[in-house]
Amino acid sequence: MVVPFFDQHWHAQSSSTLSWSLAVLLVSLAGALWTWSRTTSRAKIGAAAVSRAPACPPELLKDDLQGGVANAYTFEREITVPFDIGDTRVSKILVHPIKSCRGTSVTESRYSPEGLENDRRWCIIEAESHAIITAREVAKMVLITPHIEVDPAAPHGGRLVVSFPEDSECETFSVPLHPSQDTVSDWPVIDDCTMFGKYLVQGYVCAALEPEGRSPSEILSDYFGRSVHLVMKGPRVRPCGPTEAFPELKASAVFQDGYPFLVASEESLEEVGRVISRFAQDETPQGRIGGIDRERWRDGGVNIERFRPNIVVKGSGVPFAEDMWRQIVIRPNEPTKGSDETRTFTLVSKCTRCLLPNVDTTTGVRDAAVPYKVLMKFRTGKDPARKSKACFGCNAVVGGEGVVRVGDRIEVKEWATGIGV
């Protein structure tokens, strides 16, 4: 039986003795349930385990007790795994050729252990420090549109076309899609493209496909208002860090923040939208979120592109079901070559979120509150390694090469235990 994560809501507006008693009772019950769930989880063996989250966001309970008001938005019920995920399928595939720039929705994509084909294969760096620039710092990056044009008959197998908003007055340029070794031998090599101040990734400074005209670096520098370079990932392997669930993880990536793939579900997105809407409509002190535009977010409506996933799934009917998947097989509708091993994706950790999803992908403007501050109200404590961070989606790796298509079926091969991956 499928039991939704989020299905009970209450809102009391009185600070009377009755409300105070009710709030204290709820806290006591939540504590008892938490203790019982810990004992039950440890007693389970194998794939069948029990996962529970706090009865409601701790900070909301704290506010309730201080003000004598019961004002919890979400009451989380027990979820027993394994559960029936129904006819869950891939509903969207998103490729982001240049890190932090606009993504492209595709119906199918080849993949390798380093991610979807051409996903985050390029990035933009500071010319002097070689720090990788993201939309966390420069929100208008999301308005740069990279477009892959594949042409097997072309010298470089096609090209990456990069265009800009019309009002920027920056001209469109192209770079080789798969430059030959002879070609890149003339490109400057950067051995220390820096990510988060610790990852040093190798890359080539790209030259334009058309020799006449300005270089990609010159055009992008105009857009950014400072000296920058477009860089293509070099051959040196960039290893991924270990996770709490996989301390011996051996995986590599290109210019992704952490891991080759990000998996998320439409049900999770809908739940985030519902909670955003509830906060936007609540005008009580306990429902206040600083900077939220109540009129704009009254109906929720945040889009999945803000979270920059690669593989979006739909069908389980359970928000955040992906939190409890350890391994999934993405199986094609029609029989094709390839083994389950190359189709098995391991979800190695939850994806902790920064302010980047606050950037509107259509305007390049960062919202003051949504979704980050809302996620911080009910999605913290999910990642055992970073309990203070809010989570949405799961990072994943794969052991081989293959093709993923919209409509492919999701099968859970192994379930996570405790609080999930």
Regions from the PLM with identified roles:
Residues V2-V421:
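Metal-cofactor-dependent catalytic cores
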